Amino acid sequence: MTKSSELYQKAQQTIPGGVNSPVRAFNGVGGSPLFIERADGALIFDADGKAYIDYVGSWGPMILGHNHAVIREAVIDAAQRGLSFGAPTEMEIAMAELVSELVPSMEQIRMVSSGTEATMSAIRLARGFTGRDKIMKFEGCYHGHADSLLVKAGSGALTLGQPSSPGVPADFAKHTLTATFNDLGSVRELFAANKGEIACIIVEPVAGNMNCIPPVEGFHEGLREICDQEGALLIFDEVMTGFRVALGGAQAHYNIKPDLTTLGKVIGGGMPVGAFGGRKEVMQYVAPTGPVYQAGTLSGNPVAMAAGFACLNLLKEEGNEKRLAAKTKQLAEGFKVLAEKHGIPMVVNQVGGMFGFFFTDQETVTCYEDVTKCDVERFKRFFHLMLKHGVYLAPSAFEASFTSLAHGSKEIDATLEAADRCFAILAEEAK
């Protein structure tokens, strides 16, 4: 038995399921999860001392690679002056100014401690600003575990939302409408059936929680137009895509200006940070200037702000955005070529520094229904084969994978060599 397996058994005695976030339990792929002891650059090292090329990156934040020296020193320096004050600091101003510089639609910004806090607060703000109760999300998109967002579609486009988790009251879920990602017709249909009642649309501009699904041409432009026509706010949930799809986020990549944006992951440089922001007239509704209440003991934590500030300043250095996208494209295209070489049907999607692949005969994968038709069992087999060859992919067929600036030619070449061998095994097993 490996040390990771021993630790997993021990963890289950005091931690529900042995993990502090469900996907870490490897339920999506089977087997025991890796317990990580340390990480550096593009590598993680498990409790048994084995190294893996990492394409999870702590689920997105480690865009510069693990344990970056500059971020580490920024954290140490900040910690030496105090861990938390519960009072404003100058670094909060600097951080807000930097985020606004990189994401100009965020004219004012409120820091929080997680992506879930950011989306939950943005939804409350949209409701308060518009005076409307209903919100619209998309099937297959995830926006954190707030009650109003743990909702799935009913049986038909015009039915009320249904809770996707016990503990979410049906009376609460009924205010959440679910449309089909990349389908403007479903959006218009819901607005027509709920005239003057919808406060906002919240969307992952690149859906990263049903693997990696980019928008089809005109989709985001259509959302912007519909929101303007209907008096609803457009919220881009850039917790995953922010600073990763492009330095200015997916909104810069697709040239769309949302009313509100939520951020997480990369913004903290590895520390727990989230943020929401947008048009000044909307943000002025947030307490203490406005009536929409939001607060947090650790919001704007000085150590976390120092880490995020260091991360974003490094990230904005010239050439980094293009380098990240180029190496991710090289990896994604390499997967596709090798799959074709071995006769493995596969769709590969990639935007900026995120990518995903689907074992499927379909020509494209553009929505949740397409994702559900993919071969999850083959993904599970491929995941474990790659893990055996020292490559750590996202342990779920429904999660995106990520590269970092620390992934060099050596790591990408080694990953593709491993993929070549693993695809060969899959092809042989299919005979």
UniProtKB/Swiss-Prot annotation:
Its EC number is 5.4.3.8. Its main location: cytoplasm. GO terms for biological process: protoporphyrinogen IX biosynthetic process. GO terms for cellular component: cytoplasm. Keywords: Cytoplasm, Isomerase, Porphyrin biosynthesis, Pyridoxal phosphate. GO terms for molecular function: glutamate-1-semialdehyde 2,1-aminomutase activity; pyridoxal phosphate binding; transaminase activity. The modification N6-(pyridoxal phosphate)lysine is found at K265. Pathway: Porphyrin-containing compound metabolism; protoporphyrin-IX biosynthesis; 5-aminolevulinate from L-glutamyl-tRNA(Glu): step 2/2. Its cofactor is pyridoxal 5'-phosphate. It is found in: Cytoplasm. It catalyses: (S)-4-amino-5-oxopentanoate = 5-aminolevulinate. SUPFAM superfamilies: PLP-dependent transferases. Homodimer. HAMAP family: HemL_aminotrans_3. Belongs to the class-III pyridoxal-phosphate-dependent aminotransferase family. HemL subfamily. This is Glutamate-1-semialdehyde 2,1-aminomutase. It comes from Vibrio campbellii (strain ATCC BAA-1116). The gene is hemL.
